[in-house]
Amino acid sequence: MYNINDLIYNWSFALFDLANDEGILKELTADVVKVIKVLKRNKRYLEILNSYNVDLDVKFQKIDEAFSGNNIHLINFIKLAAKAAVAKFLIQILVRFVEISNQKLNVKYGTIFTTIALDEVKVKEFESKISKKLNAKVILKNEIDPSLIAGIKIKIDDYVVENSISGYLNELKKSVIKK
C-alpha cells in the first residue's frame, strides 16, 4: 500500500521537474491551472479515466480530445496517470504541482475583500502595488465582504493589509479591552 500524500507529491514533483528542466514551467503552470478548472467542473471525467471498465485506448482518445490545446507534456502526464490508475488523484496532484511551481516562480495568490465589486483595472492596480511591496508576482481575486464598513482588506498567506473602518474599530476595541 502506498501513502497517498507521497504519491501526490511524487507525481506533482515529477511534472515540476520535467517542466523546470524543459524551461516551460510558467507556460505549463498556466495550462495546469486551466486543466484543474475543467476537472473540477467535470468530476465524472476522472471516474472514466480511473475506471477499469474503459479501455486504455478510449481513455487516451478522450484525453486527446479534451486537452488537445495544452502542452504535450501535460497531455502525456494525464495519460500516464490514467494508465497507472492514479487519475482519481489528478486534481490533488495538479494543485500540488501549481503550489510547487508558484514557489519557484515567486507567485502568490490572495484575496482583496471589499464592500462592492472592483473592476479588473482596480484589481490589477492593487496587484501591482502589492507585488512591489512583497517582491513577488501577486494575483488577487475580489470578494465581497459585507462585514467591512467601507475600505478594503487584502490577505495573501499571512500578510494582511486592512484599511477599513471595521478594522479600525476592531483595533480600538482591542486596545480598550487591554486597558
From Swiss-Prot:
Keyword Ion transport: yes
A GO molecular-function descriptor: proton-transporting ATP synthase activity, rotational mechanism
Keywords annotated in UniProt: ATP synthesis, Cell membrane, CF(1), Hydrogen ion transport, Ion transport, Membrane, Transport
Cellular compartments annotated: Cell membrane
CC terms in the record's Gene Ontology section: plasma membrane; proton-transporting ATP synthase complex
Gene3D superfamilies noted in UniProt: N-terminal domain of the delta subunit of the F1F0-ATP synthase
SUPFAM superfamilies listed in its UniProt record: N-terminal domain of the delta subunit of the F1F0-ATP synthase (SSF47928)
Top-level taxon: Bacteria
Membrane topology qualifier: Peripheral membrane protein
Cross-referenced InterPro entries: ATP_synth_OSCP/delta_N_sf, ATPase_OSCP/dsu
Record-stated family: Belongs to the ATPase delta chain family.
Quaternary structure, from the entry: F-type ATPases have 2 components, F(1) - the catalytic core - and F(0) - the membrane proton channel. F(1) has five subunits: alpha(3), beta(3), gamma(1), delta(1), epsilon(1). F(0) has three main subunits: a(1), b(2) and c(10-14). The alpha and beta chains form an alternating ring which encloses part of the gamma chain. F(1) is attached to F(0) by a central stalk formed by the gamma and epsilon chains, while a peripheral stalk is formed by the delta and b chains.
Function recorded in the entry: F(1)F(0) ATP synthase produces ATP from ADP in the presence of a proton or sodium gradient. F-type ATPases consist of two structural domains, F(1) containing the extramembraneous catalytic core and F(0) containing the membrane proton channel, linked together by a central stalk and a peripheral stalk. During catalysis, ATP synthesis in the catalytic domain of F(1) is coupled via a rotary mechanism of the central stalk subunits to proton translocation.
Protein name according to UniProt: ATP synthase subunit delta
